[in-house]
Amino acid sequence: MPTRDELWTKVQKLLQKNLSKPSYETWIRPAEFFDFKDGCLTLLAPNSFSSDWLRKNYSQTIEEIASETFGHEVKVHIKVKEEFSSNKSNKKKNFSNVEANSIATSENSDVKSKQTPIKKFLPSLNLRYVFNRFVVGPNSRMAHAAAMAVAEAPGREFNPLFICGGVGLGKTHLMQSIGHYRLEIDPGAKVAYVSTETFTNDLIVAIRKDGMQAFRNRYREADLILVDDIQFIEGKEYTQEEFFHTFNALHEAGRQIVLTSDRPPSQIPRLQERLISRFSMGLIADIQAPDLETRMAILQKKAEHERMRLPRDLIQFIAGRFTSNIRELEGAFTRAVAFASITGLPMTVESVAPMLDPTGQGVEVKPKQVLEKVAEVFGVTEEEMRSPSRRRPVSQARQVGMYLMRHGTDLSLPRIGESFGGKDHTTVMYAIEQVEKKLSSEPQLASQVQKVKDLLQIDSRKRR
């Protein structure tokens, strides 16, 4: 009669046949057999992320195959290995192939860390941007699935992975989740995360300091490169030239490339045809604005992470009023929580609604009014905002004006650009993104923007 260990080995072989190789190698092989008692099969996952993923995506398959193999119903419990570290010497039943694989992985990681200076590949990843905090909806299902596939098996199916979509829809979140995932699986992985602006600045510094070889080594030695906002490479001929060769070097070496943009490659103006071709050779995954159910799920998940309980009607109220993007939605949530905390009022629709929509309805304003009020609050003139001046006060006022026109009017990006002396629509888009990024970290700017909104009675949800 086969032992439990032999039966588990048989289960593993059947799982290997039923699952794709990347899925088996990434999720099943690292899991260790811990115990089998009273019809319960206990497995140990290497970390909490793997444990959650196994439980959510593979527990049913494991239960079905194990039940068939053991000859009776089997329930699977998946635990985190670290939780059992104190008694693993007494209870844990390991297999030599798994143990050897763990040792080999550890040794390889040590070799990698010795060969490559750590500081070269320390990605500035946001700790919040991980897969288990990303809410998947119809708007993002394909992009999420592609990101997971790339994270599990980099350099194979979708290379490059090109994620595109509007501002604040989760492109950066998905991209950085891939980086976190790879580092979770392989701490020695060389992950490079940069914005296109950083890549360009690094290139300029390298040219000035005669450091092109070091620059090329830094980017071309990466196992995984994540480049955010690649649309800003438009019109930068030398940057495009260098990125073309970097792309080729990485792709030919089988390294994974992930790019994000606010539009598909073919719609990026002044982008070299050869780059359009290369950016399109993998998979282009689009993210759309989330629907009502997804927006509600996003708010619910955020509330859970903040350890707060929000009434369902309040969640539905906020989700129904902030429809453009996730960043705007989460901003409304933060304001509602802060308002309730400061005032001591309960978190209800009645108490929060006036703060989120003080006028009761979105007020349409004219571009001229925006210019007037921004000039008044920021201490510049309307003429200066329409001029090419790059003085910081003027530049900041101009960006805020573009941001508020987008939120308070129905003007398209090109029409907003016309209101500021014929600025290009990409300049307007960049200005909007910059203001949105700064609002959470620069209280003075946030106060000035709110003051203009109050003067104009702009409903913050008035954005098409």
Swiss-Prot record:
Domain IV, binds dsDNA: annotated span: 341-464
GO BP annotation list: DNA replication initiation; regulation of DNA replication
Positions of the UniProt region annotated as Domain II: 84-123
Pfam families per the UniProt record, alphabetical: Bac_DnaA, Bac_DnaA_C, DnaA_N
PROSITE patterns: DNAA (PS01008)
Gene3D superfamilies: 1.10.1750.10, 1.10.8.60, 3.30.300.180, P-loop containing nucleotide triphosphate hydrolases
GO MF, one annotated term: DNA replication origin binding
Subcellular location as annotated: Cytoplasm
Subunit relationships: Oligomerizes as a right-handed, spiral filament on DNA at oriC.
Functional description taken from the UniProt entry: Plays an essential role in the initiation and regulation of chromosomal replication. ATP-DnaA binds to the origin of replication (oriC) to initiate formation of the DNA replication initiation complex once per cell cycle. Binds the DnaA box (a 9 base pair repeat at the origin) and separates the double-stranded (ds)DNA. Forms a right-handed helical filament on oriC DNA; dsDNA binds to the exterior of the filament while single-stranded (ss)DNA is stabiized in the filament's interior.
Protein family: Belongs to the DnaA family.
Protein name, as recorded: Chromosomal replication initiator protein DnaA
Provenance organism: Prochlorococcus marinus (strain NATL1A)
Top-level taxonomy: Bacteria, Bacillati, Cyanobacteriota, Cyanophyceae, Synechococcales
